[in-house]
Curated annotation (Swiss-Prot):
One of its GO terms (biological process) is adenine biosynthetic process. It comes from Listeria monocytogenes serotype 4a (strain HCC23). NCBIfam families: purM. It is found in: Cytoplasm. This is Phosphoribosylformylglycinamidine cyclo-ligase. Signal peptide: none annotated. Keywords: ATP-binding, Cytoplasm, Ligase, Nucleotide-binding, Purine biosynthesis.
């Protein structure tokens, strides 16, 4: 086939067609009740009536993966970064009590590599399966003048639904509520500009560096995918009146826990009430960071926090354990005097 004008401009249309064929099997495994239409339609569709909600409220979220992508590109490992993208979106809307319904992805790249694109979308589909969301659409944009041939960016968008009376807002959290923390897998998807600076600029480590405190090579630790909390937390929401949920992302405990509070409330976080993952101690040491800086930037081993009444603590923990989750009572809600987040106790190793 003769090279057309678009190809001469650096856009490989044929490679785009190959990507569509390669990803069909991954998209197919994310099908769920309510999803409509087929891959390749102009718009993704979802039948909201299939949920039989009386007063449905739609909750949307969008996010990317940040500079964690640079590690995936440098390591040439692209099959889990899509999980991160899904996690960052669905965990956010879960914080409002919403069940994720569908997801769309956007990949921008300098050169369309069908094998690489399939790996990325496979990760997105894996994340959608974990979240119970249908992958109903997406876009792969080849822009050779915007990106290098090996570079790409990844972003996602999700929509979920919740009954209006069950929508979780900041006004529901009360003084005396207990904070229950659910573990993270590691750094998740925030703070990677600092992470990369600490390890690869300041300390000049290599991707495959072996650090005694870690049980895997450094890059493997740093690319561990963000946990998706949808299924266990939705099970809790069926049985417990959860007053607040925080997705611990960029800004760590200090920035995120107050997002579920009104201005007259604060949280006391008991340090030492959960195991801090080794990677955080490693970063603290290599980056010469103090403990409070760590809690202002990273999740420190807790990726999601639920606020529940004291009477519901035992049942909440039971449901989480029944759904394969470790969970920890990490603090309580109190009246605010100065800071919105108060740390007490000491770090648990």
């Amino acid at each position: 086939m003769a090279e057309n004008a678009y190809s001469k401009a650096g856009v490989d249309v044929e490679a785009g067609y190959q990507v569509v064929e390669r990803i069909k099997k991954h998209v197919a495994r994310t099908e769920r009740l309510g999803a409509m239409g087929a891959l390749g339609s102009f718009g993704g569709m979802f039948d909201l009536s299939s949920l039989h909600l009386k007063e449905p409220v739609l909750v949307s979220g969008t996010d990317g993966v940040g500079t964690k992508l640079l590690l995936a590109i440098e390591a040439d490992k692209h099959d889990t970064i899509g999980i991160d993208c899904v996690a960052m979106c669905v965990n956010d809307i879960l914080a409002q009590g919403a069940e994720p319904l569908f997801f769309l992805d956007y990949i921008a790249t300098g050169k369309t590599d069908p094998v690489k694109m399939e790996q990325i979308v496979k990760g997105v589909a894996d994340g959608c399966e974990q979240a119970g969301a249908a992958l109903i659409g997406g876009e792969t944009a080849e822009m050779p003048d915007m990106y290098g041939s090996d570079d790409y960016d990844l972003a996602g968008f999700t929509v979920g639904a919740v009954e209006k009376q069950k929508l979780i807002t900041e006004g529901a959290v009360k003084e005396g509520d207990t904070l229950i923390g659910i573990p993270s897998s590691g750094i998740h998807s925030n703070g990677y500009s600092l992470v990369r600076k600490i390890f690869f600029k300041d300390n000049e480590l290599t991707l495959d560096a072996e650090i005694s405190e870690l049980d895997v090579p450094l890059v493997e630790e740093l690319l561990k995918p963000t946990r998706i909390y949808v299924k266990p937390v939705l099970e809790v929401l069926k049985e417990v009146d959860v007053h607040g949920i925080t997705h611990v992302t960029g800004g760590g405990f200090v920035e995120n826990l107050p997002r579920m509070l009104t201005n007259d409330l604060a949280v006391k976080v008991e340090l030492g009430s959960w195991p801090v993952l080794p990677i955080f101690d490693v970063m603290k040491k290599y980056g010469q960071l103090n403990e409070m800086e760590m809690y202002e930037i990273f999740n420190m081993g807790i990726g999601m926090v639920l606020a529940v009444a004291k009477a519901d603590v035992e049942r909440t923990l039971e449901v989480l354990v029944q759904n394969g989750e470790a969970a920890y009572v990490i603090g309580e809600v109190t009246t605010r005097e100065n800071d919105a987040v108060i740390f007490t106790g000491g770090t648990k190793g």
